[in-house]
Curated annotation (Swiss-Prot):
Keywords, in A-Z order: Cytoplasm, Hydrolase, Metal-binding, Nucleotide-binding
Cofactor(s) recorded in Swiss-Prot or TrEMBL: a divalent metal cation
Highest taxon of source: Bacteria
Binding residue positions for a divalent metal cation: D8, D9, S39, N91
Family, per entry: Belongs to the SurE nucleotidase family.
Organism: Nitrosomonas europaea (strain ATCC 19718 / CIP 103999 / KCTC 2705 / NBRC 14298)
Name of the top EC class for this enzyme: hydrolase
Protein name: 5'-nucleotidase SurE
Keyword Metal-binding attributed: yes
Annotated PANTHER family: 5'-NUCLEOTIDASE SURE, 5'_3'-NUCLEOTIDASE SURE
NCBIfam families: PRK00346.1-3 (NF001489), PRK00346.1-4 (NF001490), surE (TIGR00087)
Entries under SUPFAM superfamilies matching the protein: SurE-like (SSF64167)
Amino acid sequence: MRILLSNDDGYFAPGIANLAKVLLEIADVTVVAPERDRSGASNSLTLDRPLSLHKSHNGFYYVNGTPTDCVHLAVTGMLDELPDMVISGINDGANMGDDTVYSGTVAAATEGFLLGLPSIAVSLVSMSRGNFPTAARIVVDLVKRFTENRFHIPILLNVNVPDVPYDELQGVEVTRLGRRHKAESVIKYQTPRGETVYWVGAAGAAQDAGEGTDFFALQNNRVSITPLQIDLTRYDQIGYVKNWLTL
């Protein structure tokens, strides 16, 4: 089993280090990750400059680009053999509901999927307890299951794991994405030099968080696994828009 491992927190992040360590016990693992934190980079590709690839002292490769760049570069230009699977994470923080649109973690897995590879994004719904071994163990379980019973269709999974010890988990649930309220307003302040600057506001609170959603699973200390797709079409609105255009 050959695994390409990436993330959006950077090659130095504890999540990817924890995951690489346990995956190396069951697979050949190549780590290609951003040289710095690229959280929120979504599916962006770097097109305005060339990318460079370097190898760290710990054997991880890092790229001066986005999570999507990392996977694209590795699969299409770096690796001599294609990986059997792409895994992105472990992200330090949730990627539930609307988060998936912005997430570099999900984006790295999405790029693997677009390149024809089974892909998994995994996030620790962090409360600063640092239970990365819990999330890593969940990923190992999924990889072993994949090895024993490979998917017969292309698959892209978004996994969120409660920030608790493994023995406190209340199970695993296949879920749909919930929704958040709109994001908080930007935070505006002045620097000591009088310049007005802004920080992006916090994500909105959970809105659609009922039973069956990723939010609900995490609230009940269950691992959430959500199958994702690329097609963003609102099929139920095609007829409505056609009628609107003919008015």
